[in-house]
Amino acid sequence: MSFKPLHDRIAIKPIEHEEKTKGGIIIPDTAKEKPMQGIITAVGTGTRNEKGEVYPLELKVGDKVLYGKWAGTEIEIKGEKLIVMKENDVLGIIN
C-alpha cells in the first residue's frame, strides 16, 4: 500500500534526533520545543483557484524541510511513521 496526499497536502518522514545533556541524559524529540525536520516522501497535485486551475506545490519529493512540532497528522503506512500536513505548515527547506 502506498500513500498519495490530496490537493495541497504533503507526506513527511520525520528525522529523529536524540540529544544528550552534559550529564548523559537523553532528551527525546517529544521534550523539545524546537522545529522538527523531515524528508518529503509524497506531495499532492496542488491547489485549485476559483477558475479550477491547478497551482502545483513548491515542495517536491526528497526535500528536507523544517516544520512545527505540532503540525500535521501522524499516520503509519507499512510500519513507517509519516506526518501529513498542508504545504503552508512547512517553515522552510533545508539545503
UniProtKB/Swiss-Prot annotation:
NCBIfam families: PRK00364.1-2, PRK00364.1-5, PRK00364.2-2, PRK00364.2-4. Heptamer of 7 subunits arranged in a ring. Interacts with the chaperonin GroEL. Keywords: Chaperone, Cytoplasm. The gene is groES. GO terms for biological process: chaperone cofactor-dependent protein refolding. CDD domains: cpn10. SMART domains: Cpn10. HAMAP family: CH10. Together with the chaperonin GroEL, plays an essential role in assisting protein folding. The GroEL-GroES system forms a nano-cage that allows encapsulation of the non-native substrate proteins and provides a physical environment optimized to promote and accelerate protein folding. GroES binds to the apical surface of the GroEL ring, thereby capping the opening of the GroEL channel. InterPro entries: Chaperonin_GroES, Chaperonin_GroES_sf, Chaprnonin_Cpn10_CS, GroES-like_sf. This is Co-chaperonin GroES. GO terms for molecular function: ATP binding; metal ion binding; protein folding chaperone; protein-folding chaperone binding; unfolded protein binding. It comes from Rickettsia canadensis (strain McKiel). It is found in: Cytoplasm.
